[in-house]
A protein has these predicted regions:
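Cell-wall glycan-active module
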Residues: 8-388
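Bacterial N-terminal signal peptides that target proteins for export
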Residues: 1-2
Length: 388
């Protein structure tokens, strides 16, 4: 298979115009044969993957199916609601060590500290002192259990504790306070961020129902497959899509853009795949990033007529395919080719650290993508034995 065909088979968009039309596809009973031998309920997983890819218009090529299989296997080993070793104790430690800090970060110093105090009181004394929420938290085994416990705690608070302060906090954040403060933000068998699922809801219902859907086998797969596959990128290797799954859409392409920019300046940009600075809620900050400042400097030194305002406008498209059509992207690739005599770089591995209470230690995107890629290669070996 050519590199071009492979890259096309790994891309998606709404009208399917990015897909290779010629490759043979797998049926439901063939998809189950691509799963690792240890997977339970193989037929059900295979059918769900087939049905979801069919619904989303994703051809069931070996490459596409194995990309999906590899990520599911990495994130959950094909368990819809997997147990997380030591999760309860980690959650308790996080609450005890960083509760006040996190609430103030989410709600501000004035209200955050007050609500944190209420929360601590509820943890220690409710629903009763002998079997309090803190003890229940220690006993949780799965992410879903912890998520549901947090929701129960916030529901209790809203009904019994200082309603006026909680209402004020809710007005401040503009949403359900329990959802705002819930630390479980990635869910299900493919660990999809709740914010992404909200933007791409497959059915009606409130946020609690969406969370429940993500913990189901079908729902977890649906949102994960959507996040992994439903955007076009000209990657010549699947590993870059796996990196994007961990560090953000187009982060591999954007890290390559930063790498080219590094070769045009004396600065040493971090190759994290973020060309702008972002707030924790995902909104763009007004302050200029180092990448943005270096672009302005490089363009000025080389008499490239792209204004700072245009640069900012272009960089706002960094999470989209059309960033590649901007004056900024084209100017950098052209200048890079002129200055170095090399072809422009389309993708490299982003340098991003992964951390969180569910992890035993910090990792980076390269670790994640490499692990997924190993599972992808194993899946492709199994797929080669399937005649289609």
């Amino acid at each position: 298979m050519s590199i071009l065909t492979l890259s096309l088979s790994l891309m998606a968009c709404g009208d399917s115009s990015w897909w290779s039309k010629d490759e043979p596809t797998l049926k439901s009973d063939q998809i189950k044969r691509t799963l690792p031998p240890r997977v339970n309920q193989r037929e059900a997983w295979g059918k769900d993957i087939f049905d979801i890819t069919q619904q989303l218009g994703i051809p069931q090529t070996k490459e596409n199916i194995c990309s999906i299989v590899a990520v599911v296997d990495q994130e959950s080993n094909f368990v819809a609601d997997p147990q997380v070793p030591g999760l309860g104790e980690k959650a308790v430690k996080e609450v005890q060590d960083r509760l006040d800090e996190k609430f103030k970060d989410k709600l501000g110093d004035a209200i955050g500290g007050t609500v944190a105090g209420y929360f601590q009181d509820v943890l220690k004394n409710q629903p009763n002192p002998k079997d309090n929420y803190l003890g229940q938290m220690r006993r949780v085994k799965t992410e879903r259990e912890l998520d549901e416990l947090y929701r129960e705690i916030f529901d209790y608070m809203s009904k019994h504790y200082h309603v006026s302060a909680l209402t004020g906090a809710a007005k401040l954040v503009g949403q359900d306070i329990g959802e705002k403060l819930n630390p479980i933000t990635t869910l299900g068998s493919m660990q999809v961020h709740i914010g992404y699922a909200k933007e791409h809801k497959r059915q009606g219902g409130n946020i609690a129902e969406l969370r429940t859907d993500l913990y189901s086998q079908y729902g977890g797969l649906y949102y994960g497959i959507h996040r992994l596959m439903m955007y076009p990128a000209d990657y010549d290797k699947a590993i870059y899509r796996f990196a994007d799954y961990n560090s953000g859409m187009y982060s591999s392409r954007n890290a390559a853009f930063q790498s080219m920019l590094n070769d045009l300046t004396v600065a040493e940009l971090e190759l994290d795949g973020d060309l702008l600075l972002y707030n924790k809620d995902g909104s763009i900050r007004s302050v200029s990033s180092q990448s943005e400042r270096e672009l302005i400097s490089v363009f000025a030194r080389n008499n490239i007529l792209v204004t700072p305002r245009q640069i900012r406008t272009d960089l706002k498209k960094e999470k989209e395919k059309k960033f590649e059509d901007t004056a900024t992207y084209r100017a950098v690739t052209k200048l890079y080719e002129e200055k170095t005599g090399k072809k422009p770089i389309y993708a490299i591995m982003p340098e991003v650290v992964i951390s969180g209470p569910k992890l035993s230690r910090d990792y980076n995107t390269n670790w994640f993508a490499t692990r997924v890629n190993g599972r992808y290669q194993s899946c492709m070996q199994r797929a080669k034995r399937i005649k289609i």
